[in-house]
């Protein structure tokens, strides 16, 4: 062997780039908050750290702070094989052209789906967030009973603190702000007759029970609630529906037809959706007028509207039909409609997309839906 031969040179290792995960958590959260939510399911598969951050409350708060949050539809259903209600959120597949599937043989592209909560698609059940003056109040709608209410000043994203607790622990609660007070109903044991419904006054920082609506409402499942002209209308799983008047602290039975027509307000225009028509209220002539351009939607959608919601500057509607061929299941349809005022007395609608978003057993119960920033 030649002693003069040069020893073999060690191969130089390429400079490894610093790991993204080596960055401080605050920076990671800030980066993730700038990415559209539709990409989160794939990102959560990268590693456990990403999955943990995507499910974290810190990311939710950061998206609100940066203004990158998106309006997301949340739906609550009672499924026959589940003891507790199940929450779902609407997920849109990224970089896809959404289509109108009404009248088509292929009923779903699966580009829009209702996915279970919690999951990488949507980490948590939506919260009630009510605004009173300069403060925001939050109450969880999770299936785990809790009496906690949170409050923070609107100018400080991170400074949530505990507000006075509700008198009883509630799960999947209904809550509304009316005339500067927070009204909560249900979510507790049916025998909690005194505190089945209560109201919080921010001025006195106290909770006060409302009049007992009676056992029939307390033991039933609430499947709809609406506020109109300062009154709370409650639709339950029985034949009767109820209305509560905060001014008189009084419950009354109301005609069920009030809850059949679903309404929402967009840019100071009230819209109404029923089994066979879509209309808007002309305040000048004090009459309801048909929304033009939606004849195909009205003709194909011959079933009851489940819910209507404001979806940004558009309107979102949900309805159900029996699924062929054996009709053992139901298909939940979702459509997003853009609205345009063309003349003084004309409003036109255009279906931006419509598709089946979930198939469920026919015996399921639709409880409610909400559009929340996430």
Curated annotation (Swiss-Prot):
Pfam families: F-box, Kelch_FKB95. It comes from Arabidopsis thaliana (Mouse-ear cress). This is Putative F-box/kelch-repeat protein At4g39756. PANTHER family: F-BOX DOMAIN-CONTAINING PROTEIN (PTHR24414:SF185), F-BOX/KELCH-REPEAT PROTEIN SKIP4 (PTHR24414). SMART domains: FBOX. Kelch repeats lie at residues 135-180, 181-227, 231-278, 280-308. Residues 17-63 form the F-box domain. InterPro entries: F-box-like_dom_sf, F-box/kelch-repeat_ARATH, F-box_dom, Kelch-typ_b-propeller. Keywords: Kelch repeat, Repeat. The keyword rRNA-binding does not apply. It comes from the Eukaryota. CDD domains: F-box_AtAFR-like (cd22152).
